[in-house]
Amino acid sequence: MLSVNPSMGLFEPLDLASLPDDKTAMSIEGLDLHYGNTQALFDINMRIAKGQVTSFIGPSGCGKSTLLRCINRMNELVDGCRVDGKIMLHGQNIYDSKVDVASLRRRVGMVFQRPNPFPKSIYENVVYGLRLQGLKERRVLDDAVEKSLRGAALWDEVKDRLHENAFGLSGGQQQRLVIARAIAIEPEVLLLDEPTSALDPISTLTIEELINDLKTKYTVIIVTHNMQQAARVSDQTAFMHMGELVEYSSTNDIFTTPKEKRTEDYITGRYG
């Protein structure tokens, strides 16, 4: 079994099946997803703990990124996608026809596998979402840039070149810039889809340390193929296989005493 970082808050395990509303960031209820005639997710039910890091793990094609993209309705950009069931955020189903998708994505930010800064300056990357919200006052924008870059552990590295093109940053710096851009609009939930898969080991470690800091202000959900990474950074772990949620528990339990044989087989390398 993998060792779990004891600094990740695992000594106060939550009963995820009966997580109270005040400790729940969102709940997923009876979620199915189809791409055309192909079903990709099957009856997913889970409560995401507020202010913690939850990881989705499983073999390629198991549905973990698909589930992640349901949480801010990114899957709707795929032709033929149909979602049934509910994802409740503060008592409202995000799939309700009355929900404004742009507003939802401000509340639920997302960072993708490869760094995707805009072809703009570092400064303009960070304030992009704020400008879309109509913020124009320079002092407010300046404060937001510093706060967000500090929150992404990047300020000290770029504070003297904020107006240089973001493409001049290293890959790891670009990914932290993307995180700064995401948190500048102060989301409630931050989704990370394999955020270190394109980075070198040193940049990966920096991002992992950042994730631990981010959970003090945001609920973080991360998809990762790297089981060691899930063990290091997350408080809760969900194991998925063939579109099903096989097991969902504290990271400590998943990696040391899994209840399901499929979970044990995966984390011990018998398949995946």
UniProtKB/Swiss-Prot annotation:
A biological-process GO annotation: phosphate ion transmembrane transport
Catalysed reactions, as listed in the record: phosphate(out) + ATP + H2O = ADP + 2 phosphate(in) + H(+)
Domain ABC transporter: 26-267
SUPFAM superfamilies for the chain: P-loop containing nucleoside triphosphate hydrolases (SSF52540)
Enzyme class: translocase
Pfam families documented for this protein: ABC_tran
GO cellular component annotations of the record: plasma membrane
Keywords per UniProt: ATP-binding, Cell inner membrane, Cell membrane, Membrane, Nucleotide-binding, Phosphate transport, Translocase, Transport
Membrane topology listed for this record: Peripheral membrane protein
SMART domains named among the record's database cross-references: AAA
EC number: 7.3.2.1
Positions that bind ATP: 58-65
Record PROSITE patterns: ABC_TRANSPORTER_1 (PS00211), ABC_TRANSPORTER_2 (PS50893), PSTB (PS51238)
Location, primary (coarse class): membrane
Listed InterPro entries: AAA+_ATPase, ABC_transporter-like_ATP-bd, ABC_transporter-like_CS, P-loop_NTPase, PstB-like
GO molecular function, one term: ATPase-coupled phosphate ion transmembrane transporter activity
Localization: Cell inner membrane
Family of this protein: Belongs to the ABC transporter superfamily. Phosphate importer (TC 3.A.1.7) family.
NCBIfam families: 3a0107s01c2
Subunit structure: The complex is composed of two ATP-binding proteins (PstB), two transmembrane proteins (PstC and PstA) and a solute-binding protein (PstS).
Role played: Part of the ABC transporter complex PstSACB involved in phosphate import. Responsible for energy coupling to the transport system.
Protein name in the entry: Phosphate import ATP-binding protein PstB 1
Source organism: Photobacterium profundum (strain SS9)
